Swiss-Prot record:
<feature type="transmembrane region" description="Helical; Name=4">
    <location>
        <begin position="130"/>
        <end position="150"/>
    </location>
</feature>
<feature type="transmembrane region" description="Helical; Name=2">
    <location>
        <begin position="73"/>
        <end position="93"/>
    </location>
</feature>
<feature type="transmembrane region" description="Helical; Name=12">
    <location>
        <begin position="434"/>
        <end position="454"/>
    </location>
</feature>
<dbReference type="GO" id="GO:0055085">
    <property type="term" value="P:transmembrane transport"/>
</dbReference>
<protein>
    <recommendedName>
        <fullName>Trehalose transporter 1-like protein</fullName>
    </recommendedName>
</protein>
<feature type="topological domain" description="Extracellular">
    <location>
        <begin position="50"/>
        <end position="72"/>
    </location>
</feature>
<feature type="transmembrane region" description="Helical; Name=11">
    <location>
        <begin position="403"/>
        <end position="423"/>
    </location>
</feature>
<dbReference type="InterPro" id="IPR005829">
    <property type="entry name" value="Sugar_transporter_CS"/>
</dbReference>
<dbReference type="InterPro" id="IPR036259">
    <property type="entry name" value="MFS_trans_sf"/>
</dbReference>
<feature type="topological domain" description="Extracellular">
    <location>
        <begin position="182"/>
        <end position="184"/>
    </location>
</feature>
<feature type="topological domain" description="Cytoplasmic">
    <location>
        <begin position="94"/>
        <end position="105"/>
    </location>
</feature>
<feature type="topological domain" description="Extracellular">
    <location>
        <begin position="290"/>
        <end position="305"/>
    </location>
</feature>
<feature type="topological domain" description="Cytoplasmic">
    <location>
        <begin position="1"/>
        <end position="28"/>
    </location>
</feature>
<feature type="transmembrane region" description="Helical; Name=6">
    <location>
        <begin position="185"/>
        <end position="205"/>
    </location>
</feature>
<dbReference type="InterPro" id="IPR005828">
    <property type="entry name" value="MFS_sugar_transport-like"/>
</dbReference>
<feature type="topological domain" description="Extracellular">
    <location>
        <begin position="354"/>
        <end position="372"/>
    </location>
</feature>
<comment type="function">
    <text>Fails to transport trehalose.</text>
</comment>
């Protein structure tokens, strides 16, 4: 049975509509798992402030004073540093390679956590968080590019969500450990997490596309053999890679910045930027960074630390649901479901906090914030959490993938910084209800953005996606009606 959502959005509820068969080679799974362990570290450090600030601001535990303003900077400086890391990461993945850039973040991740763990003043914590954020920015840019360039189309959706799954495990580990560890011990745990990632990253190869871009055909062939299996015939794929690179070289200009603003490149860049905007302005990082405080403010009858653990568990399992569904239903259907779930729950949360502030009495509804948060996290983790990152690695053209991904990542972290740094001020100015209703209204706009502009990429090779985005191949007669400017 199929549902027609748009000309490019066909969904099968039994098997993939185009009969694609997954090809999970051990080497592809190992490559995806290796880089995804970096995402586990990212998830842990991103969630760190939620449990850590509680003990960090307790003068009986901490030998130095952490004011409310300083505490907001402990949470807010990481996305600001990630913005800088995102800008830096674009040139790095082009010159050093995707794998080498990811690997280079491992030791700084360890050092930054040790700096926080051994801190004797707020400045040391802020320096550690800044270095952490800088590495997070580089990693969040590099991971989807690496996976997009190494995984086959049949498994790119499933294995491409592994970073999100392990990132959510990192968040869950942080929540669970934070319920019985103080901020210093939690940071020591954070310093240990990058070690397995560091070891495994040494084993896997660079992406074949990067080798082709560097004119290293033989090394590209060896990388493909490693990824596809020794018995696989990689010559057709290598030939397609080299042809795609030749096409890109013919159309390229000397100035990379000018390339970004060419009409054909601006279209996928704008779509990717839009997805990142609606991802962050759904309010997700305000929820993650300030979960404990939000539950306290709501007067929830459930222990706040237990609440965060429950949210983390839901986040984890929702991502695995996404892994199962993404190559069956496609990207757009999951984005629709995600957006609708967030709109409904944010509206209800806004209503709860409005009644709490202005009446009637809702003290007997202490379970409601947790229920809404669970559904909100479930919806976000199914779609708007992982898919913007996955699609960034899919729809950006090969020739500008590094600098374009840098722009998109920096923009994402800028939005993250704005949301996390202003969330507390926003709740003061508008009330918690106003903040949640504002995020809900933005989600409504995001739903229309997905319907109108976002293409479906399920089962397509990166070369096919690029050709269609550039308009180099004819579309089906239905799609050629082109009711929307960015239709694919």
């Amino acid at each position: 049975m199929k549902i027609l959502m748009r000309a490019d959005t066909h969904v099968s509820f039994s098997v993939p509509a185009d009969g694609l068969k997954a090809n999970f080679t051990f080497s592809q799974v190992l490559a995806a798992l290796s880089v995804s362990l970096c995402s586990l570290v990212v998830g842990f450090v991103s969630a760190y402030t939620s449990p850590a600030l509680v003990s960090m601001t307790d003068r009986t535990i901490t030998s130095f004073e952490v004011t409310k303003d300083a505490g907001s900077w402990v949470g807010g400086i990481m996305p600001l540093a990630a913005l800088a890391g995102g800008i830096t990461g674009g040139p790095l993945i082009e010159y050093l390679g995707r794998r080498s850039t990811i690997l280079a973040t491992a030791v700084p991740f360890i050092v930054s956590s040790l700096l926080i763990a051994c801190a004797v003043n707020v400045i040391m914590i802020l320096c550690g968080r800044f270095l952490t954020g800088f590495c997070v920015g580089i990693a969040s840019l590099s991971l989807p590019v690496y996976l997009g360039e190494t995984l086959q189309p049949e498994v790119r959706g499933t294995l491409g969500l592994l970073p999100t799954a392990l990132g959510n495990i990192g968040i869950l580990v942080c929540y669970v450990a934070g319920s019985f560890m103080n901020w210093s011990m939690l940071a020591f745990l954070g310093a240990a997490l990058p070690v397995p990632f560091l070891i495994l990253m040494i084993i896997i190869p660079e992406t074949p596309r990067w080798f082709v871009n560097r004119g290293q055909e033989e090394r590209a062939r060896k990388a493909l053999k490693w990824l596809r299996g020794k018995e696989a015939d990689v010559e057709p794929e290598l030939k397609e890679l080299m042809q795609s690179q030749a096409d890109a070289d013919r159309q390229a200009t000397q100035n990379t910045c000018l390339e970004l603003f060419k009409r054909n490149n601006l279209k996928p860049l704008s779509i990717s930027l839009g997805l990142m905007f609606f991802q962050q302005f759904s309010g997700i990082n305000a929820v993650i960074f300030y979960t404990v405080q939000i539950f306290k403010d709501a007067g929830s009858t459930i222990d706040s630390n237990l609440s965060t653990i429950i949210v983390g568990v839901v986040n984890f399992f929702a991502t695995f649901m996404g892994i199962i569904l993404i190559d069956r239903l496609g990207r757009k259907i999951l984005l629709y479901v995600s957006d609708i779930a967030m709109i409904v729950t944010l509206s209800i949360l806004g209503g709860f906090f409005y009644c709490k502030a202005h009446g009637p009495d809702v003290s007997h509804l202490g379970w409601l914030p947790l229920t809404c948060f669970v559904i909100y996290i479930l919806g976000f983790s199914l779609g708007f959490g992982p898919i913007p990152w996955l699609m960034m690695g899919e729809i950006l053209p090969a020739k500008i993938r590094g600098p374009a991904a840098s722009v998109v990542t920096a923009f994402n972290w800028f939005c993250t910084f704005v949301v996390t740094k202003t969330f507390q001020d926003l709740t003061v100015a508008m009330g918690a209800h106003g903040a949640f209703w504002l995020f809900g209204a933005i989600c409504i706009v995001g739903l229309f953005f997905v319907i109108i502009f976002v293409p479906e990429t399920r089962g397509k090779s990166l070369e096919e996606i690029e050709r269609k985005m550039m308009g180099r191949v004819p579309m089906s007669s239905v799609v050629n009606i082109k009711p929307f400017p960015f239709n694919m």
